[in-house]
Curated annotation (Swiss-Prot):
Protein name: Bis(5'-nucleosyl)-tetraphosphatase, symmetrical
SUPFAM superfamilies assigned: Metallo-dependent phosphatases
UniProt EC number: 3.6.1.41
Nucleotide-binding among keywords: no
Pfam families according to UniProt: Metallophos (PF00149)
Length: 273
């Protein structure tokens, strides 16, 4: 049995399949973890959704910002982004089933046996693990059981940009969604920045990668995330695993076998733009 973790798919279905062939993935005995953003700019988002769903218990994903945006467009709240290639999803006979399955996926996964925590974008520098798990469950409960139309309609905002235990209701949920699915850089006072998507080397000096801020959790816990393609080839602390290496941007898709920490890569098969 082996545990594999893979970076953002973004509709790059063929590259995923080649990686799974390379590692001889066996869904009967192996487990595949996905850091989110199954859909968006690649041309096989529908295939990615169907495949991951078909794996059942052999796969575990977390929701990314593009996955949430797909739910939003499915509800008619937002329009499909011009760069996204998700049209086939909306005309698929299993469209409703796929969207319902997607909104039942978590924002955070803690595999205690393998000793890693996975989310799409990261963990707030102001959270310990219990707080992170609690905040994730609060959002998941709304998406899965509550008035998720209201939540999805009101999640598009950059405020609040700083954590407080006193946050309640929509403010608290929105902060959590932004941390789990959108965060990259923070200021020294832990305020979230959403403007900069650059590499660490090219970012303004006042911005700090979230995982380099002072949080005891970041020093002891294995953290796995995607979302940040411009981090490719940028060193991170030994316990921080950044798996989005920009396949949809013409770079490569990266898969990590957890047991021996061996990486497998597959270059982009085409220019998606």
């Amino acid at each position: 049995m082996a545990t594999y973790l893979v970076g953002d798919l973004q509709g790059c279905y063929d590259e995923l399949q080649l990686l799974l062939e390379t590692v001889q993935f066996n869904p009967v005995q192996d487990k595949l973890y996905l850091v989110g953003d199954l859909v968006a700019r690649g041309d096989k988002s529908l295939e990615c959704l169907r495949f991951v769903k078909s794996l059942g218990a052999a796969a575990q994903m977390v929701l990314g910002n593009h996955d949430l945006h797909l739910i939003s467009t499915a509800l008619g709240i937002k329009k499909v982004s011009l760069q996204d290639h998700v049209e086939a999803i909306f005309t698929a006979p299993d469209f409703v089933e796929l969207i319902d399955w997607l909104r039942h996926q978590p924002l955070l996964v803690h595999d205690e046996k393998c000793d890693f925590v996975m989310s799409h974008a990261g963990i707030s520098p102001d959270w310990d693990l219990d707080t992170a798990k609690s905040c994730a469950r609060e959002v998941e409960n709304e998406l899965q059981h509550g008035d998720y139309h209201y939540l999805i309609s009101n999640m598009y905002d950059n405020q609040p940009d700083r954590w407080s235990a006193d946050l309640q209701g929509l403010q608290r949920l929105r902060y959590s969604i932004n941390v789990f699915t959108r965060m990259r850089f923070c200021y020294r006072d832990h305020r979230l920045d959403f403007a900069c998507k650059a590499s660490v080397e090219k970012a303004p000096q006042e911005l700090i990668p979230w995982f380099n801020l002072d949080n005891p959790l970041f020093k002891v816990q294995n953290l796995v995330f995607g979302h940040w393609a411009s981090l490719v080839d940028t060193p991170t602390p030994a316990n921080i695993y950044a798996l989005d290496t920009g396949c949809v941007w013409g770079n490569r898709m990266t898969m990590l076998r957890w047991e021996d920490k061996q990486y497998f890569v597959q270059g982009a098969l085409k220019d998606y733009f």
